[in-house]
Swiss-Prot record:
Name of this chain's protein: Calmodulin-like protein 11
Transmembrane segments: none
Alphabetical list of PROSITE patterns matching this protein: EF_HAND_1, EF_HAND_2
Record bears the keyword Calcium: yes
List of residues binding Ca(2+) 3: 117, 119, 121, 123, 128
The family this protein is said to belong to: Belongs to the calmodulin family.
Record bears the keyword Repeat: yes
Positions of Ca(2+) 1 binding: 44, 46, 48, 50, 55
Keywords assigned by UniProt, alphabetized: Calcium, Metal-binding, Repeat
Compositionally biased spans, kind Low complexity: 1-26
Entry binding sites for Ca(2+) 2: 80, 82, 84, 86, 91
Sites where the protein binds Ca(2+) 4: 153, 155, 157, 159, 164
Gene3D superfamilies referenced in this protein's UniProt entry, alphabetically: EF-hand
Amino acid sequence: MEEIQQQQQQQQQQQQQQQQQQQQQQELTQEQIMEFKEAFCLFDKDGDGCITADELATVIRSLDQNPTEQELQDMITEIDSDGNGTIEFSEFLNLMANQLQETDADEELKEAFKVFDKDQNGYISASELRHVMINLGEKLTDEEVDQMIKEADLDGDGQVNYDEFVRMMMING
């Protein structure tokens, strides 16, 4: 009885994963899908519809992504849904959809940082933060602005650099 329930749970999980994957794939444009298919086929030497982990690394790098070895291992573990050690095109497509979403988030953070960094010197000062907060309708005291800077300023230089800004945004989401 318990075994049947476990099988049903596994089937439900697989169906949910497939639905998520289909949704992610739908967010890709036809042009993106064709570009990914082209790259995938270039490295699928024997034409069996699968690529190895090493080939995956080469494909991803050919698409201007530069993951570390650990990131590659994590990707493979995450996307090799059937656990056969090779990557089918549908699994590859899911990976690339995820990568694009992460890239979009990075771009949004860079744009947000530029809004705060008025003089474009790579740092957000207390006065720049105060200026943006006032424009957003936030009436903060000097102490509150200083406190915000202090919380985000990990290296203690009195300003917030991009890495500190990203960390702050990830924590406060």
